[in-house]
């Protein structure tokens, strides 16, 4: 299964509660924090919620 490397590039401060909760659910707490997740529809939906705060790259597993 493909993997996604998700990096937080902007702060969640000033965002909605839902955006901050989504960052926490993805495992992102600080700027430049990176996490690797499976490429699943649920994760893609979370990324869509915070697309302006994160950078997403596909990585080989």
UniProtKB/Swiss-Prot annotation:
Keyword presence, Thylakoid: no
Domain of life: Bacteria
GO biological process assignments: translation
Family annotation (Pfam families): Ribosomal_L30
Keywords, alphabetical: Ribonucleoprotein, Ribosomal protein
Gene3D superfamilies: Ribosomal protein L30, ferredoxin-like fold domain
UniProt keyword Ribosomal protein, yes or no: yes
Coiled coil: none
GO cellular component, one term: cytosolic large ribosomal subunit
One MF term in the entry's GO annotations: structural constituent of ribosome
InterPro entries per the UniProt record, alphabetical: Ribo_uL30_ferredoxin-like_sf, Ribosomal_uL30_bac-type, Ribosomal_uL30_ferredoxin-like
Listed HAMAP family: Ribosomal_uL30_B
Complexes and interactors: Part of the 50S ribosomal subunit.
Similarity remark: Belongs to the universal ribosomal protein uL30 family.
PANTHER family noted in UniProt: LARGE RIBOSOMAL SUBUNIT PROTEIN UL30M, MITOCHONDRIAL RIBOSOMAL PROTEIN L30
Protein name: Large ribosomal subunit protein uL30
């Amino acid at each position: 299964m493909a993997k996604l490397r998700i990096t937080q590039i902007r702060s969640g401060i000033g965002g909605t509660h839902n955006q901050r909760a989504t960052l926490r659910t993805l495992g992102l707490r600080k700027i430049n924090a990176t996490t690797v997740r499976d490429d699943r529809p649920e994760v893609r939906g979370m990324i869509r919620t915070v697309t302006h705060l994160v950078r997403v790259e596909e990585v080989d597993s």
